Amino acid sequence: VTETLLDLKGLKCPLPVLKTRKALTRLNTGDQLTVLTTDPMAEIDIPHFCQENGHELLAAEKLEGGHRFQLAKGG
């Protein structure tokens, strides 16, 4: 399992979801992606993106000034 960090701090909707989608295309099923974002909409958008596209949301954490999401690429 590969673990990748994607720092999207400072980007606004819809860029965090678009860049997350692009990063996941380069990973294999089961690989993990950690996404850091400061966009308040990501709290809704990233979990919804995972649910709609078959990826697993392993963790969602509210940080000071943003969020950290840990995803596993679905098959």
Question: Model-found features: residue ranges?
Answer:
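A generic structural signal for beta-strand entry/edge sites
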Residues: 3, 32, 66-68
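Right-handed parallel beta-helix/beta-solenoid
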Residues: 1-7
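C-terminal structural segments of small proteins and small subunits
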Residues: 47-75
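Amphipathic, hydrophobic secondary-structure cores in small proteins
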Residues: 8, 15-56
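Intrinsically disordered, low-complexity sequence elements enriched in Ser/Thr/Gly/Pro
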Residues: 10, 17-19, 66, 71
